[in-house]
Amino acid sequence: MSIPEVGKKIRVTVPSTTANLGPGFDCLGAALDLHNEFIFTRIEGGGDRFDLIMESTDGNHLRGGPENLVFRAAQKVWESANMEPFALEARVKLAVPPARGLGSSATAIVAGLIGANAIMNSPLPKEKLLELAIDIEGHPDNVVPSLLGGLCLTARSSSQRWRIIRCDWHDSIKAVVAIPAIRLSTSEARKVMPKNVPISDAVTNMGALTLLLNGLKAGNDELIKEGMFDKLHEPYRWKLIKGGLEVKDAALQAGALGCAISGAGPSILALCKKENGKEVSQAMVKAWEKSGVASRAPFLNLQTTGSQFSTISSR
């Protein structure tokens, strides 16, 4: 396999994700229509050169190097394809805010895998990219929907293979995501969780997840209300999110069917019917204002196509 010519460009768009949705800890996630865009260019130099230029929505520019997740993912592709590394530049337009529980790390991993693979004319199948993405991230709930799109349930089978189920999401159910101007790292959010939980809590979550998935499939309000409930991670994480429980209560009082921490937080996901969306969004923002936290709460539709790439220039 030959190294791509200098100047070849690939555009990759990767959706944000909301993980867990309450009871689906580390196994359930949904892609949302907020995207990061990556432009990969083959540049002069060897595999130890990787230039990452990031432009955020506020116009700020940041730079990153070989320690970045995008580059680490690209390296995994080269290793798996038995390909000699080559120099890459990645320009990123950031719309997914980092450390907010919206899968920003997953977008970096997925983009690095797809970009490096596509610029070499895709020697690795999508199944292999999924395997590499889960290996890098350590859990599947963000990277799988980020790559595939839609609502995805991922579990390791008795044969130790990853099994992915694309679940239905009824058109009548909409997502409002309250995104605060505060950050919370995944590592910090995981530190507060216990290593062991009562079996009764595990059983409760299994039942809740079943109710939630059936409610989302049928658009059944009551099943969603009863299923969007968690005892494995949220009881320990709410204390890390300033004003979070008040935001949840405000969303439910405004008509949300259910409310949960998005991923590791601090963003908060509310599921509702379209006619309640505006009231839910406003209530969540106002509740955070009372705690001294600025936020925004946009409607984010389910993104069903997953990550996409296109060739901008072949040389």
From Swiss-Prot:
Question: Cellular component per GO?
Answer: cytoplasm
Q: Which reaction does it catalyse?
A: L-homoserine + ATP = O-phospho-L-homoserine + ADP + H(+)
Q: Does the keyword Transferase apply?
A: yes
Superkingdom of the organism of origin = Bacteria
Question: From which source organism is this entry?
Answer: Prochlorococcus marinus (strain MIT 9312)
Q: Which GO terms describe its molecular function?
A: ATP binding; homoserine kinase activity
Protein family per UniProt? Belongs to the GHMP kinase family. Homoserine kinase subfamily.
Positions with a binding annotation for ATP: P97, P98, A99, R100, G101, L102, G103, S104, S105, A106, T107
Tell me what this protein is called: Homoserine kinase
Q: Name one Pfam family in it.
A: GHMP_kinases_C
Please name the pathway. Amino-acid biosynthesis; L-threonine biosynthesis; L-threonine from L-aspartate: step 4/5
